[in-house]
Amino acid sequence: MKMPRRDFLNVSTAAAVVCATTLLPVEKAAAAQQTLAAQNLLEQAYLYAFPLVIMDATRTASTNTRTATSNKAPINQFIHAEKLADATTRAVVTPNVDTIYTQAFLDVGAEPMIYGVPQTDRFFNVQVLDAWTNTAAVLETPGLYAITRADWQGELPEGVQRIDVPTTMVWTIARIVLSGQEDLPNVRAIQDKMQLMPLSAYQAGGWTAPAGSYDPANDFVPVKHVLAMDAKEFFDTANQLMETNPPAAADAPVLRELAALHVGPGEKFDDKALGLFSGLRWKLMLLQLKKKLLSESKGYTRQMGQWTYFGDPIGNFGTAYTYRTMVALRGLGANTTDVAIYPKTDVDSTGTVLTGKKTYTLHIEADPPTLEKGFWSVTAYGENDFLIENPIDRYCVNDRSGLHRNPDGSIDITLSKEAPADTTNWLPVGEGDFHLFLRIYKPDAAALTDWQPPVVRTN
C-alpha cells in the first residue's frame, strides 16, 4: 500500500528528529535536554509573534496598489467593498457574507487619523484593531474620531473624540449589514459619507489622497505567505515590527524568556540559537501547529448544543497567546462577544464529520434572540476556511433570505452539493468536508443561555 505523501513527510520528519536525538551519546544527554527546551521555546516564540506577523502580511497584501479599489487601497485610505465576499475572496479566512466591509490599514506613527462615522438606521460599526489583533475600540455612534497612537501628545479639534491605540499599525473594519443585492446602492451611499484623513489634512480643510505603490511580489494570500516563512524570515519580521508596535507591559515575562532566541524589540534573530537540526525542528513545529492550537485553545471554547464558539477573552486577549494565534489563524479580525459570536460545527447530531457526500437538514427551532439592529446567519466553508464555490453563488442563509418557515415558525435548511427541487432553503456545499458558522450579531444574553441552537441531521 502506497503511503500518502503528506503522511510520509510527517513520519519521515518525526523519525529524523527521533534518530537525531537517540543517536547522541549518553554523555550528551544534557545537550539533548537543551535541544528539547529550545524546541519548546521556539514554539512559544512562534505562538507569541504569529498574530503580529499575520497582521502585517495582511496589511502588505491589502495596501499593495497605486490607487484605491474595491479590495485594496494604499495606507490610510478606505477599501470600500462593492459586493459581498464570494468563493474568490482570499484576503482573510472565514469571511462573512452578511455585511459589506469598508476597511483601512492606518499608520498613526506621525499623527492621528480622523475617522468619520455617518448616521444610519441599520447595523453599522467600526472595529479598531491594534497590530497584535486586539480590539482597541468599536465605533458605533455617529461623529468624528481621532485614531491616535497612545503616546501621541497634541491637541484635537473640538468635537473630535480621541481613540487611543498602543501600536503604530492599525486596522479598521467597518461592517454594514446588507439585505440583498438590491440594497447595495443604499450601502454605497453610507460608504460615501464615511471620512478618513490625517489630522493635519482635516485641520487644513481637505486632502487629496496620495498614490500608493505596487509590487508583484506582494500579491499573496497572507496566511499561506506567513506559514511558508522560514524561522529567520519570520522572526526578523516580528522583531522589526515590535520596534513600532511595542508589546504590552504584561508581555515582559515572556519576552525575557524569548530573549534567549533573540526574539523581541531591538533583537537580531540568529537561527544558530536553535542549535542542531534547526530547520528540521521548524518544519516539525509547523506540521504540529494546528493540532497544538486546537488542543490548547479548548479552554476558551464554549459549548452551544452541537456548536462551539470562542468566548472571552476573544478580541482582548491579554496574555492568552496561544488563543490569540488560534483566532488569528482561523478568523482574523474576530469581534468581541458583545458585538458578535460565531458558533461553529463540523459534525452532525451524531458527531460524524460533515461531508458533501451526504445531504443534511439544519433545523432552526427559533431565531436566536438579538438586541436592536442585531441579526443572524449560517455560512458554509470548505476545509481551507474559504467560501465554497457553487452554481447559484449562495454562501449563506440568514434572517433576510426570505426563507420558507414551517407552520410553527421553525426553519429547515437543506445542506447538500446537489440542488433540491425547491432551492429556497438550500445552502450549497462542496464535495469535501465542510463546516458551518452560525453568526449572531448583537446577541441578547438569552442567546447564550435559554435559546435552543440549531441541529444538523443527516437525511
Locate the predicted segments by residue.
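Generic low-complexity, intrinsically disordered sequence content enriched
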Residues: 13, 27-28, 45
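Bacterial N-terminal signal peptides
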Residues: 15-21
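Acidic/proline-rich low-complexity IDRs
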Residues: 22-23, 40
